[in-house]
Amino acid sequence: MRRVSIFDSTLRDGAQGSGVTFSVEDKLKIVKILDQLGVECIEAGNPGSNPKDLEFFQRARQIPLRYAKLVAFGSTCRKGRRPEDDENLRSLVQAGTDFCTVFGKCWRFHVDCVLETTEEENLRMIRESCRYLKALSLIHI
């Protein structure tokens, strides 16, 4: 029989819906329920952009989980910064999760207008961020 792994992003992506807000207590309760359901990975928030998520990860470490692994979410390092000196990546490490999810921009418009950097610098940010987190065993490529 094939094994199905579930990666749930309700606590991170679902919280971006209009009118949706989760308190730290809400998130802790939902984590327990998802674990009871056998969900393997729970992407629970972005500790680098939200103090409430940072508090959640600190408190969630105390919850004994049977099945689930918590996953922190965040972006690559900022332009001109080394990954080990970037506050956002530092918050992913400090979240204390077994894994993390990172995103990088790939649309030229975002690279130019949101990141305000070159394609080469953007690729460096992605490459070095992934290399740094992989060395800490927080991502698997």
Predicted features by range, described:
Residues R2-D8, S23-E40, N50, E55:
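N-terminal glycine-rich anion-binding loops that anchor highly charged ligand groups
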Residues A60-L65, L89-T97, R131-A135:
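Acidic (Asp/Glu)-rich catalytic clusters
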Residues K27, D53, D85, N122-I126:
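Aromatic/hydrophobic pocket-lining residues that form the small-molecule binding cavity
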Residues G14, L34, C100:
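Conserved, mostly hydrophobic/aromatic
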Residues D8, T97-C106:
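Non-cysteine beta-strand/loop elements that form the S-adenosyl-L-methionine
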